[in-house]
Regions:
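C-terminal helical subdomain
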Residues: 173, 185-223
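Conserved NAD(P)H cofactor-binding loop of Rossmann-fold oxidoreductase domains
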Residues: 81-87
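Short alpha-helical oligomerization interface
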Residues: 88-101
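Residue(s) in the substrate-gating loop at a strand-loop-helix junction
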Residues: 131
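Active-site helix of classical SDR
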Residues: 111, 147
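Conserved glycine-rich cofactor-binding loop
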Residues: 10-11
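Rossmann-fold cofactor-recognition segment
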Residues: 45-60
Length: 241
């Protein structure tokens, strides 16, 4: 029996991934801040889903995760879908700091907890949703793009650490483009993808234990050309949504 814990499963990509894993026979633990949404999803497959209210910015979240793992009966896959982001060209401090609190502090808190759990087992799979926004610094969303770059680098560092310690821990860094979720409530975004379609690509990548996946093919082209742009030119480009 395969077991997964999904953090940030109350909506969007996390919720859709949870549904697909249940269809594939996984037993899953879903966690997030909105208990009502968790209960609604649990009702669709009560024999396969357990729930836990959890906020990644809470210092006690790792302790809750440990309890949740025991409640599920173990964990083979840790999937982190919790994150926030906003355009903030005016650099409002509360937006920048809230973004880093969730996407850096909360991310680090949960991923290190999962790593340490799998370290005791000697194996496991850690997957996290970052973004193509981590490819370059985005002037319209400084904290968001910077925190996503942090996530890319942190996962890379843990992958190296896992090998150094001779652990059989797999890592999947999921980098989608624009997805129609609660994060994109305002503004007009090009090439907008639906969460259920993105989730299908993610589950396929998880089953294959892919190290990095950019979703979808259009955004793979975008990222390819972004990487070719030199810094002096990038900083002069008026990047907008």
């Amino acid at each position: 029996m395969k077991r997964a814990i999904i953090i940030g499963a109350t909506s969007g990509i996390g919720e859709e991934v949870a549904k697909l894993l249940v269809q594939q026979g996984w037993h899953i633990g879903i966690a997030g801040r909105r208990e009502e949404a968790l209960e609604k999803l649990q009702a669709t497959a009560p024999g396969q889903i357990v729930i836990q209210r959890l906020d990644v910015t809470d210092p006690d979240a790792p302790t809750l995760l440990e309890t949740f793992i025991r409640k599920l009966g173990g964990m083979d896959l840790f999937f982190l879908s919790s994150g926030i982001g906003s355009q903030n060209p005016d650099l409002k401090p509360e937006i920048e700091l809230n973004t880093t609190r969730t996407n850096v502090e909360g991310f680090t808190r949960m991923v290190t907890s999962a790593f340490n759990y799998f370290k005791t087992r000697g194996e496991g799979h850690i997957a996290a949703i970052s973004s193509i926004a981590g490819t370059k610094g985005l002037g319209i969303a400084p904290a968001y793009s910077a925190t996503k770059r942090f996530q890319n680098t942190y996962i890379e560092a843990l992958a190296q650490l896992s090998r150094m310690q001779h652990l059989n821990i797999h890592f999947t860094d999921i980098r989608p483009g624009f997805v129609a979720t609660d994060l994109l409530k305002s503004g007009k975004f090009p090439m907008l993808m639906q969460a259920n379609q993105v989730a299908k690509s993610i589950v396929c990548a998880l089953n294959r234990k892919k190290r990095v996946i950019v979703i979808d093919s259009r955004y793979r082209v975008v990222v390819f050309f972004w990487r070719m742009i030199p810094r002096w030119l990038w900083e002069r480009l008026p990047i907008k949504n």
